[in-house]
Amino acid sequence: MSWGLSRVTVRFGDATALAGVSIDVEPGEVAIVVGADGAGKTTLCRTLVGLEGIDGGEIRRPDRTGFQPETSGVWNDLTVMENLEFVAGAYGLATDPARRRIETLLEVTGLGGARDRLGRQLSGGMRQKLGVAMAVLSDPELLVLDEPTTGLDPVSRLELWSFISLTAGEGKAILVTTTYTDEARRGNSVLALDGGRSLASGSVAEVIDAMPGALFESARSHGPSSWRRGRTWRIWSPEAEPVPGATEVSPDLADVVTVAALAAEARR
Amino acid sequence: MLAMTLKEFRQVVRDHRTLAMLIVMPVVLLLVFGYAASFDVDVIPTAVVGPGATNVPEQLPELFDVETADADATRANAEEMLRAGEVNLAVVTGDGPPVVLLDGSELFMARAAVQILAAAPIPGLDYVVLFNPELDTSAVLVPGLAGLIIVFVGTLVTSMSVVRERETGTLEQLAVMPFRPRDVFMGKIAPYFLIASIDIVIVLTIGTLLFDVPLNGSVLPLIVGALAFLFVALGVGVLISSVSENQAQAIQLALMTALPQIMLSGIIFPLSSMAPAVRWIGYLLPLTYFNQVAKGVMLRGAGLGDLLMPLALLVALGAVIFTLAVTRFRSQLRPARVRAAT
């Protein structure tokens, strides 16, 4: 059975944080939610784990859901070991199996050498890995990780993704939010959010293939449908008409998300 | 400097709750404390016992408010009424001249009575100060001060417990864990409860040894009272923490609940001397009842039966605080259950 949201709407007063958003998270797979700051990623996570009420739609959530909040959810004044032991105790895990599971997680995350270090003494990468380990410890069917890689150095990001992939391999359904579009390739499916609305969803290939119009590259800007990408400019042509002085290029996910945002803006 | 000042002003103005406290609370506190700050004794609850119980009341000073006049009661009955705190002065009549028994644990009433008796002596009338014969101030203050110290230490410390979780983002972790709201509440206060229990033992022991405060009664009612009082004091801190947006607000709120307990719990100013509305605030404060229990046990040697009312009220306050905190936690930890989907 897949977990997730179906046409879920969440409002805070007059503001709509999520507008009819749907996402499926299959067991053994990683679903990525990508979007800029304020896109609604955290609200989506909080809604999925039951921390926000909904104004419409449906939530499919198992009894046991692991959650790592944006702040990593690590208790600063507990050691790595104490953080994990607390989670094990909270879920009523039996002592011996819990100890074995903790040791496995410490080994997999590379936190074994820091087991007696306080949460506040950990580096950003170690904190996030501990946060994910805490979320995984109770053996949840669904794991929700809110921006676990934000602010991490490239090596830490790689290590964390390796751990996430390993966890998905155990059959867990995992939802990960990120602001980095390059990370979307690590998931089985992707949902692009903007202003609480779904811009595009599906596998990365499907999302890229579904991009309307054509994409061109140029040395200079071409108005509101163009944006800087590295040292050159990308130009979106909604009707796929050639752009003078520009070369057609194949879009990647970052391009498609930007195009989707432009298209949504044009519709509004 | 102008930029810095402007930034600070903006931050202060944006924190509406703190701003309201800064502006409104001084006025409220001045009014409440102003009506509370009185050492004047207007009335002394009095019992008259013995064969002359019906004749003597008319001869007594106006300050002595005779609540009970029992011709069949004895001096032992009078002492029992004083020990239970039912009255603060008893006149024992009999074959000889009447004897006035004064409750020395109610310092200001006892002193007022002594002054009146000295100023306008009634022929043949003698008086005896019970429980605190020297009318020693520290003996009366120390039991209540022990509670006051616990209020400051316990309530302040626990007032930061939940708000700190919220600020560091770990409250969300607790929310998705299979905890019941009461588990979180009890778990929060448990370590502080143990530490504060040790604190109260230390403070009362030092008070007894250093300030010669007697321990005339059984420790059982004192233990029961102290445990109930600690539960309330720490629970108030956790409740404050659950309604505060940040640690600064929590500390301010905790101080706002601690300050009235100094002035309105009867430790410094007698409750009977306060304006009725202010006195009723005092009746809502846990320290009022802990003070009654501690003074009752330590000075008057009161037993469990004598202190049932303050003990029951402490337990009732504990139940109210527990219910409020758990209700608050329920909405914080399980908001999705509160806000129904349509």
Where are these regions (language model features)?
Chain A
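Conserved structural motif at the start of ABC-family nucleotide-binding domains
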Residues: 3-5, 18
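The feature captures the beta-strand-to-loop junction immediately N-terminal to the Walker
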Residues: 34-36
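Helix-to-loop junction immediately C-terminal to a conserved catalytic motif
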Residues: 49
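Conserved ABC ATPase "signature" region
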Residues: 85, 89, 96-114
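Catalytic Walker B motif of ABC-type/P-loop ATPase nucleotide-binding domains
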Residues: 143-147
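ABC transporter nucleotide-binding domain
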Residues: 159-175, 179-237
